[in-house]
């Protein structure tokens, strides 16, 4: 029989996989289960592996696979529903799904040959480490499933660096950005610093300052006066090649 925490984590991972196609990050799991450290998540995952409920796909990011769920008789009753906590996390990691007819064009995209996909401009590499200048090479386009996109204009960027790995964003990943100059606290954004540098970080407003937070303890949070940072878009999706 699983412990309550093991069962809650299994439900959490299964729900996230069904919703997004990949498992939640360790930070999201830690927050959802109200644990103080990621080591607790590691222990729970190892226990679920040993009992044959989970499988880890090694050398892949956020690659947990639910093999089976416990039978009803052996399931503990969780104190709270595991899908309720903000593991759904920053809105950036829950891509909007467009409902209804897709016969009309979406602003900012080109139609792809596949009716279920559109082509977004691929603007180059963005730093998830030290900021680098984004390239606007609009001769490159990327085919993206249409249900990843919300309203408005979108573009894609390739990630360079490792400062967002705890948010499940790795060097070489392609991020899908919804163009916007507004973002809520905690959202992962494309930030333009001093009109010269572009970086992908989590945004935090602190009075008259803006903090750009990494998701890797080896990198430091950078804090700027609010007038030095402009939001260029919000992260809504991620593509990865294996």
Curated annotation (Swiss-Prot):
Protein name: LexA repressor
Disulfide bonds: none
InterPro entries in the cross-refs: LexA (IPR006200), LexA-like (IPR039418), LexA/Signal_pep-like_sf (IPR036286), LexA_DNA-bd_dom (IPR006199), LexA_repressor (IPR050077), Peptidase_S24_LexA (IPR006197), Peptidase_S24_S26A/B/C (IPR015927), WH-like_DNA-bd_sf (IPR036388)
EC main group: hydrolase
Function: Represses a number of genes involved in the response to DNA damage (SOS response), including recA and lexA. In the presence of single-stranded DNA, RecA interacts with LexA causing an autocatalytic cleavage which disrupts the DNA-binding part of LexA, leading to derepression of the SOS regulon and eventually DNA repair.
Enzyme Commission number(s) from the entry: 3.4.21.88
DNA-binding region boundaries: 26-46
Catalytic site: 163 (for autocatalytic cleavage activity), 201 (for autocatalytic cleavage activity)
Keywords for this protein: Autocatalytic cleavage, DNA damage, DNA repair, DNA replication, DNA-binding, Hydrolase, Repressor, SOS response, Transcription, Transcription regulation
Species name: Granulibacter bethesdensis (strain ATCC BAA-1260 / CGDNIH1)
Chemical reaction(s) catalysed: Hydrolysis of Ala-|-Gly bond in repressor LexA
Gene name of the record: lexA
HAMAP family for this protein: LexA (MF_00015)
Single annotated GO MF: serine-type endopeptidase activity
